């Protein structure tokens, strides 16, 4: 059963009961997933930017937006308009497919994985996790990568508090660390 179908049929009613909500539309849901990668030192290298864009496109199955510097910062050796990273925003079916792959395939492939930190919520029910290496995703083949690069994954929810967001992600199967 797909994650979207499971959310509608089992997770939503269970959360409504657990959080004692009167209306089904009050139940927290995932709005979007943003996958972001800052290039850092590699920003000057066009080849690493292209490799980054291609990897994110393979992982998410969607076109990648190159993020550019808003203003020049001499200390970081960047000029205005220089490419400094890339990002993808996933919504709808692609978002649920990505979350399912992340939870069931990618996270268990992390070395010495004991669960994701339950403290990475922002106070409004949104969750951010950092991934250190892109090879945990099955779409990326180890032989074709030129460098190990990480990424930030932000899961934006309609939850009003961290507890609601944590309950939603736990029901979806997110493996949180047990203290």
Curated annotation (Swiss-Prot):
Keywords, ordered alphabetically = Ribonucleoprotein, Ribosomal protein, RNA-binding, rRNA-binding, tRNA-binding
Return any one Pfam family short name. Ribosomal_L5_C
Q: Which InterPro entries match?
A: Ribosomal_uL5, Ribosomal_uL5_bac-type, Ribosomal_uL5_C, Ribosomal_uL5_CS, Ribosomal_uL5_dom_sf, Ribosomal_uL5_N
* UniProt GO cellular component terms: ribonucleoprotein complex; ribosome
SUPFAM superfamilies in the record: RL5-like
Query: What molecular function terms (GO) are annotated for this protein?
Result: rRNA binding; structural constituent of ribosome; tRNA binding
Gene3D superfamilies, per database record: 3.30.1440.10
BP term (GO), one: translation
Query: What function does this protein fulfil?
Result: This is one of the proteins that bind and probably mediate the attachment of the 5S RNA into the large ribosomal subunit, where it forms part of the central protuberance. In the 70S ribosome it contacts protein S13 of the 30S subunit (bridge B1b), connecting the 2 subunits; this bridge is implicated in subunit movement. Contacts the P site tRNA; the 5S rRNA and some of its associated proteins might help stabilize positioning of ribosome-bound tRNAs.
Q: What is said about its interaction partners and assembly?
A: Part of the 50S ribosomal subunit; part of the 5S rRNA/L5/L18/L25 subcomplex. Contacts the 5S rRNA and the P site tRNA. Forms a bridge to the 30S subunit in the 70S ribosome.
Q: Which family does it belong to?
A: Belongs to the universal ribosomal protein uL5 family.
UniProt cross-references to NCBIfam families, sorted A to Z: PRK00010.1
Q: What is this protein called?
A: Large ribosomal subunit protein uL5
Species name: Parasynechococcus marenigrum (strain WH8102)
Q: Which gene encodes it?
A: rplE
């Amino acid at each position: 059963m797909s994650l979207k179908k499971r959310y509608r049929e089992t997770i939503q009613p269970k959360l409504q009961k657990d959080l004692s909500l009167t209306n089904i539309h009050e139940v927290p849901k995932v709005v979007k997933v943003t996958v972001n990668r800052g290039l850092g030192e590699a920003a000057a290298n066009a080849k690493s930017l292209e490799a980054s864009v291609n990897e994110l496109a393979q992982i998410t199955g969607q076109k990648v937006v190159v993020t550019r510097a808003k203003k020049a910062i001499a200390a970081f050796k960047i000029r205005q308009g220089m490419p400094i990273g890339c990002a993808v925003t996933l919504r709808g079916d692609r978002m649920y497919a990505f979350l399912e792959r992340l939870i069931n395939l990618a996270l268990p492939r992390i070395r010495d994985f004991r669960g994701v930190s339950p403290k990475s919520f922002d106070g409004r029910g949104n969750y951010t996790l950092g991934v250190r290496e892109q090879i945990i995703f099955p779409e990326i083949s180890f032989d074709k990568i030129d460098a190990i690069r990480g990424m930030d994954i932000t899961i934006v929810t309609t939850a009003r508090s961290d507890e609601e967001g944590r309950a939603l992600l736990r029901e979806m199967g997110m493996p949180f660390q047990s203290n």
